[in-house]
Amino acid sequence: MALSIKVQSNIKIVQSKYIKFINKFPQIIKMGLDQAGENLKTIVVDRTHKRGLDMNNRKFIGYSPYYQELKGKTKVDLQDTNRMLQSIGSKLVSSTKAQVFFRSQREAIKAFRHQTGQGKLPVRKFFGFNKKVEKLIGKNYERFINKQIKKFKIWV
Protein backbone atom coordinates (compact mmCIF):
# COMPACT_ATOMS: atom_id res chain seq x y z
CA MET A 1 0.00 0.00 0.00
CA ALA A 2 1.37 3.46 -0.94
CA LEU A 3 0.18 7.02 -0.63
CA SER A 4 1.09 9.67 -3.10
CA ILE A 5 0.69 13.38 -2.89
CA LYS A 6 0.93 15.99 -5.57
CA VAL A 7 1.94 19.49 -4.47
CA GLN A 8 1.28 22.50 -6.59
CA SER A 9 3.35 25.55 -5.86
CA ASN A 10 2.94 29.17 -6.78
CA ILE A 11 6.68 29.76 -6.47
CA LYS A 12 7.02 30.88 -10.10
CA ILE A 13 4.34 33.55 -9.65
CA VAL A 14 5.85 34.78 -6.38
CA GLN A 15 9.33 34.74 -7.90
CA SER A 16 8.29 36.82 -10.92
CA LYS A 17 6.50 39.37 -8.69
CA TYR A 18 9.53 39.56 -6.41
CA ILE A 19 11.88 40.21 -9.36
CA LYS A 20 9.53 42.90 -10.66
CA PHE A 21 9.46 44.48 -7.19
CA ILE A 22 13.27 44.45 -6.85
CA ASN A 23 13.63 46.20 -10.21
CA LYS A 24 10.98 48.81 -9.35
CA PHE A 25 12.04 49.54 -5.74
CA PRO A 26 14.71 52.23 -6.47
CA GLN A 27 12.13 54.15 -8.51
CA ILE A 28 9.61 53.88 -5.64
CA ILE A 29 12.20 55.32 -3.23
CA LYS A 30 12.87 58.24 -5.60
CA MET A 31 9.15 58.93 -5.97
CA GLY A 32 8.76 58.88 -2.18
CA LEU A 33 11.68 61.27 -1.67
CA ASP A 34 10.36 63.60 -4.34
CA GLN A 35 6.97 63.59 -2.62
CA ALA A 36 8.64 64.26 0.77
CA GLY A 37 10.46 67.28 -0.68
CA GLU A 38 7.22 68.63 -2.13
CA ASN A 39 5.48 68.06 1.23
CA LEU A 40 8.14 70.07 3.05
CA LYS A 41 7.95 72.87 0.48
CA THR A 42 4.15 73.01 0.83
CA ILE A 43 4.37 73.06 4.62
CA VAL A 44 6.90 75.93 4.63
CA VAL A 45 4.91 78.03 2.14
CA ASP A 46 1.49 77.41 3.75
CA ARG A 47 2.73 77.98 7.28
CA THR A 48 4.40 81.24 6.25
CA HIS A 49 1.81 82.64 3.84
CA LYS A 50 -1.54 81.40 5.12
CA ARG A 51 -0.91 81.29 8.85
CA GLY A 52 1.90 83.86 9.30
CA LEU A 53 3.98 81.54 11.49
CA ASP A 54 7.70 80.86 11.72
CA MET A 55 9.35 77.43 11.70
CA ASN A 56 8.51 76.97 15.41
CA ASN A 57 4.82 77.85 14.83
CA ARG A 58 5.13 81.26 16.48
CA LYS A 59 3.77 84.46 14.95
CA PHE A 60 6.31 86.60 13.15
CA ILE A 61 7.51 89.87 14.66
CA GLY A 62 5.08 92.52 13.41
CA TYR A 63 5.69 95.01 10.64
CA SER A 64 6.77 98.52 11.57
CA PRO A 65 3.94 101.07 11.88
CA TYR A 66 5.24 102.85 8.76
CA TYR A 67 5.18 99.65 6.69
CA GLN A 68 1.72 98.72 8.01
CA GLU A 69 0.40 102.07 6.91
CA LEU A 70 2.21 101.91 3.56
CA LYS A 71 1.02 98.41 2.64
CA GLY A 72 -2.26 98.46 4.54
CA LYS A 73 -1.76 95.11 6.23
CA THR A 74 -0.95 94.00 9.73
CA LYS A 75 -0.55 90.22 9.32
CA VAL A 76 3.08 89.29 8.66
CA ASP A 77 3.15 86.70 5.86
CA LEU A 78 6.38 87.72 4.08
CA GLN A 79 4.39 88.58 0.96
CA ASP A 80 5.21 91.76 -0.86
CA THR A 81 5.52 90.82 -4.51
CA ASN A 82 4.84 87.11 -3.80
CA ARG A 83 8.07 86.16 -5.60
CA MET A 84 10.08 84.92 -2.63
CA LEU A 85 7.74 82.12 -1.56
CA GLN A 86 6.86 81.24 -5.16
CA SER A 87 10.57 80.79 -5.80
CA ILE A 88 10.77 77.87 -3.37
CA GLY A 89 11.20 74.53 -5.12
CA SER A 90 12.23 70.97 -4.33
CA LYS A 91 14.36 68.43 -6.14
CA LEU A 92 16.10 65.11 -5.67
CA VAL A 93 19.84 65.57 -5.13
CA SER A 94 20.69 61.88 -4.66
CA SER A 95 19.01 58.53 -4.28
CA THR A 96 18.65 59.19 -0.55
CA LYS A 97 18.11 62.94 -0.32
CA ALA A 98 15.61 65.58 -1.42
CA GLN A 99 16.31 69.29 -1.15
CA VAL A 100 14.06 72.32 -0.73
CA PHE A 101 15.68 75.45 -2.16
CA PHE A 102 15.13 78.85 -3.76
CA ARG A 103 15.17 78.73 -7.56
CA SER A 104 16.10 82.41 -7.82
CA GLN A 105 19.36 83.70 -6.37
CA ARG A 106 17.77 87.10 -5.78
CA GLU A 107 14.90 85.57 -3.79
CA ALA A 108 17.36 83.37 -1.87
CA ILE A 109 19.24 86.48 -0.75
CA LYS A 110 15.97 88.15 0.26
CA ALA A 111 14.98 85.03 2.23
CA PHE A 112 18.39 84.91 3.91
CA ARG A 113 17.95 88.50 5.06
CA HIS A 114 14.55 87.67 6.56
CA GLN A 115 15.90 84.48 8.12
CA THR A 116 18.90 86.17 9.77
CA GLY A 117 17.53 89.67 10.35
CA GLN A 118 20.07 91.53 8.25
CA GLY A 119 19.73 95.24 7.68
CA LYS A 120 16.61 96.76 9.19
CA LEU A 121 14.68 93.47 9.09
CA PRO A 122 13.83 91.60 12.30
CA VAL A 123 14.69 87.89 12.47
CA ARG A 124 11.87 85.87 10.90
CA LYS A 125 12.91 82.22 10.70
CA PHE A 126 10.48 80.79 8.19
CA PHE A 127 12.72 78.52 6.10
CA GLY A 128 13.14 75.42 8.22
CA PHE A 129 11.23 72.75 10.08
CA ASN A 130 10.87 71.36 13.57
CA LYS A 131 10.73 67.78 14.90
CA LYS A 132 6.94 67.64 14.53
CA VAL A 133 7.16 68.41 10.79
CA GLU A 134 10.05 65.97 10.43
CA LYS A 135 7.95 63.18 11.97
CA LEU A 136 4.94 64.08 9.81
CA ILE A 137 6.99 63.92 6.60
CA GLY A 138 8.59 60.67 7.76
CA LYS A 139 5.16 59.12 8.37
CA ASN A 140 3.90 60.29 4.97
CA TYR A 141 7.01 58.84 3.31
CA GLU A 142 6.59 55.52 5.11
CA ARG A 143 2.88 55.39 4.22
CA PHE A 144 3.69 56.05 0.55
CA ILE A 145 6.37 53.32 0.44
CA ASN A 146 4.09 50.79 2.16
CA LYS A 147 1.25 51.58 -0.23
CA GLN A 148 3.55 51.06 -3.23
CA ILE A 149 4.85 47.77 -1.82
CA LYS A 150 1.31 46.47 -1.26
CA LYS A 151 0.52 47.07 -4.94
CA PHE A 152 2.94 44.29 -5.90
CA LYS A 153 1.04 41.61 -3.93
CA ILE A 154 4.19 39.52 -3.59
CA TRP A 155 2.64 36.96 -1.26
CA VAL A 156 -0.05 35.20 -3.22
Can you name each region flagged by the protein language model?
Residues M1-V156:
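Short, Lys/Arg-rich flexible segments
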